């Protein structure tokens, strides 16, 4: 905050002297900080601290530190005028809340950056390992196995089973012939039984004929 370089004189009075209705001297200690157009600032400071206390404080402070002290005093008085309850304390609390909010947002942003970096590294690793994986997949396709999928997407094992079934339909296997053997054996047995019955009948006829002749 820039401070006025106004110096007291006989014709014009500073805001402090004007408020006190007294003549502003050339060496007025308050004229530098409360010029003629700084009535509101003086009223705020006077209401909070009192003009006599401000004058005593300035006299006790070194001249090189007076500007900084009055800047703080005027700022504190204006803050109390805007917020009679909180004053500067409320301003400090608001600033702390803003700092904490910004700090939290900064931490979240850093976490997002770390996450993006880790994802980028993972994608880079996958791209580096992709050719090796493709080669290994092609080598698996070239192996003589029964449980892999060919280029057309057909199951090699199913194709072999279909071919075997077609061959069985065209050329009956030994297993089918073996299944038919019981039927053939039963037919042979029946024929043998018929032959034995015929023999028995012939023998009976011969016996009967011989008995009749006798």
UniProtKB/Swiss-Prot annotation:
Q: Which residues form the LOB domain?
A: 12-113
| Any single Pfam family the record assigns to this protein | LOB
Under PANTHER family, the record lists: LOB DOMAIN-CONTAINING PROTEIN 4-RELATED (PTHR31301), LOB DOMAIN-CONTAINING PROTEIN 7 (PTHR31301:SF75)
Report the family membership.
Answer: Belongs to the LOB domain-containing protein family.
Protein name in the entry: LOB domain-containing protein 7
Could you tell me which species this protein originates from? Arabidopsis thaliana (Mouse-ear cress)
Q: Which gene encodes it?
A: LBD7
